[in-house]
């Protein structure tokens, strides 16, 4: 096992512990608490994968951080903070929408890279909006917290979430997963739109009809799907 992988996990465990103390003292806001809960599940998954005890890793992580802080001068810390861009937390969904439980009549689940895609295949001919909570850096999506698909009535019919045992994903991973979710929902004649906020930070542009810009590969796939549907309709007639 790579030593850097172990030390990274140990430091992450200790930093999570510090953030938990912040929440216990009622100093954290809603996004802070949301990230804390999700990181806790991620750490459990990583600990299981690495075969490491979280409590023991936290103690070692504390020693690593204390050693770094002891050697770090105040001036170096100021320079580091000044040169490091701060990420922002973007919220399309309310806390209620983010935490609400939902159920599927015809569940379908697919893993796309480090992301898990879930959708209800029973949903047909609905207008659906994709909304997400995520962090942004340099005006680009950095980390997806959670994406959900909502009908006009407010029902949740789809979701994209990071895999707890597979930490880390890129903006391309997110866009690919969104493409898969849209394709799955549109197969049942649903009309899918993406929130302007998500369009802006994931694609850097906003489409008037609410759809994300499609790659040539996605356009070819949609064309093949449309041709197949036409053939099926003709056979049915």
Curated annotation (Swiss-Prot):
Upon interferon induction, ISGylated via host HERC5; this results in the impairment of NS1 interaction with RNA targets due to its inability to form homodimers and to interact with host EIF2AK2/PKR. A motif (Nuclear localization signal) lies at residues 34-38. Its main location: host cell. The keyword Nuclease does not apply. It comes from Influenza A virus (strain A/Alaska/6/1977 H3N2). Homodimer. Interacts with host TRIM25 (via coiled coil); this interaction specifically inhibits TRIM25 multimerization and TRIM25-mediated RIGI CARD ubiquitination. Interacts with human EIF2AK2/PKR, CPSF4, IVNS1ABP and PABPN1. One of its GO terms (biological process) is symbiont-mediated suppression of host cytoplasmic pattern recognition receptor signaling pathway via inhibition of RIG-I activity. The gene is NS. This is Non-structural protein 1. Residues 217-237 have a biased composition (Basic residues). Gene3D superfamilies: Influenza virus non-structural protein, effector domain, S15/NS1, RNA-binding. Residues 205-237 are annotated as: Disordered. The keyword Ubl conjugation applies. Residues 180-215 are annotated as: CPSF4-binding. Pfam families: Flu_NS1.
């Amino acid at each position: 096992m790579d030593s850097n992988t172990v030390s990274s996990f140990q430091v992450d465990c200790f930093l999570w512990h510090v953030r938990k103390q912040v929440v216990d003292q009622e100093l954290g806001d809603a996004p802070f608490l949301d990230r804390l809960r999700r990181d806790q599940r991620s750490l459990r998954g990583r600990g299981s994968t690495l075969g490491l005890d979280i409590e023991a890793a936290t103690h070692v992580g504390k020693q690593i951080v204390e050693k770094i802080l002891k050697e770090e001068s105040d001036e170096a810390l100021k320079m580091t903070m000044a040169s490091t861009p701060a990420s922002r937390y973007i919220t399309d969904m309310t806390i209620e929408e983010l935490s609400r439980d939902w159920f599927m009549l015809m569940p379908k689940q697919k893993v796309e890279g480090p992301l898990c895609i879930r959708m209800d295949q029973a949903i047909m001919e609905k207008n659906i909006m994709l909304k997400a909570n995520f962090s942004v850096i340099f005006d680009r999506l950095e980390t997806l917290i959670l994406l959900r698909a909502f009908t006009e009535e407010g029902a949740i019919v789809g979701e994209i979430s990071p895999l707890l045992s597979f930490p880390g994903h890129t903006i391309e991973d997110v866009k690919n997963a969104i493409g898969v979710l849209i394709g799955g929902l549109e197969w049942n004649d649903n009309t899918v739109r993406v929130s302007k906020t998500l369009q802006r930070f994931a694609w850097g542009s906003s489409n008037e009809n609410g759809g994300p810009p499609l790659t040539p590969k996605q356009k070819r796939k949609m064309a093949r799907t449309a041709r197949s549907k036409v053939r099926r309709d003709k056979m049915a007639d």
